[in-house]
Swiss-Prot record:
It holds the Pfam family Hydrolase_like. One of its GO terms (cellular component) is cytoplasm. The active site is at D8, D10. The keyword Hydrolase applies. This is Histidine biosynthesis bifunctional protein HisB. In the N-terminal section; belongs to the histidinol-phosphatase family. In the C-terminal section; belongs to the imidazoleglycerol-phosphate dehydratase family. Pathway: Amino-acid biosynthesis; L-histidine biosynthesis; L-histidine from 5-phospho-alpha-D-ribose 1-diphosphate: step 6/9; Amino-acid biosynthesis; L-histidine biosynthesis; L-histidine from 5-phospho-alpha-D-ribose 1-diphosphate: step 8/9. Keywords: Amino-acid biosynthesis, Cytoplasm, Histidine biosynthesis, Hydrolase, Lyase, Magnesium, Metal-binding, Multifunctional enzyme. Its cofactor is Mg(2+).
Amino acid sequence: MTPILFVDRDGTLITEPADYQIDAYEKLRFVDHVIPAMLKLRDAGYQFVIVSNQDGLGSESFPRASFDGPNNLMLQIFASQGIEFREVLIDCSWPSDNAPTRKPGVGLMVPYLQDRTIDWARSAMVGDRITDIQFAQNLNIRGFQLRTDEFGGEWDWPGIAHELADAPRRAVVQRNTKETRIRVELDLDRVAEPKTATGLPFFDHMLEQIGKHGGFALDIRAEGDLHIDEHHTIEDTGLALGQALREALGDKRGIGRYGFDPESSPWQVAGDTAQHGFTLPMDETIASAALDFSGRPYFVFDGQFKRDRLGDMPTELVPHFFRSICDASGVNLHLTVRGENDHHKVEACFKALARALRQAIRREGSALPTTKGAL
């Protein structure tokens, strides 16, 4: 089955002039980022259909010839970039006509509503006006209103392409107790600078490593009883982050599942204690993380710290934080670190975890990575 992206024309594919009529070549301007976004959607299997209201098209005030030239040029430019439209549907009525073919009416959609090859669950409508969203509602499909100064809206073309083509794996977790208030938001399919605010600057710096080197958008906000100590804030942040990972991954279909180095990359410098994991050096320090999104939480830590604290973070809570992630996410994590500088050792642990996560959450198809039928 094929998903269809129904798109408005003026204000959506091309910018809309002040007189609302694109009846001259010099008025033709493309909306920002529309072509790369539509190419991404094309590659994701979408077909495109233009659905546009053109008030009084064919009348003396809006001759058909004035419309056809710029419209044909627009279609030629799209085609030259690899974007073809399945059909261009134009309603030429006036608003006062209340024609059933005029958006938000769906009179022009009858052949599509009868087409059983369309994947309606994935189909969507993009437009700049509220009537486009009402049109989508009448078709029972998702509607995206492009952000414009005149009509509002909250979407841009890159965001729409990400939403529809990537099927982003997102989660927002709010964990509230008498001791802490933790909010974790992540998007495993979008790269963005990490944002962290826990009241513990060193801990924030470590959390940033997870998003940065994990290759996903991460936003963590925490308010805790730091007047007592750091334990509850660090522990509950780990639990909330683990829960967010579990929710974002869903049934884990299509993921790599495991995060570790191949057999060709042994951790040779550790001597007899060598293990296989994602190996990461940091000056004199080397850390290894191997993980499995098995659904069975387990944590093994091999390492020691000489200092009691690093900044505002007790080193005894470093393994406890990782254990909390495992408990809430169902991850099996083996983490090993060797070195002299405790700052390097802790940071290497966070970075090694992040790189192992990056490998494990990577999409590699659609199959469930287990013979059990569930993870």
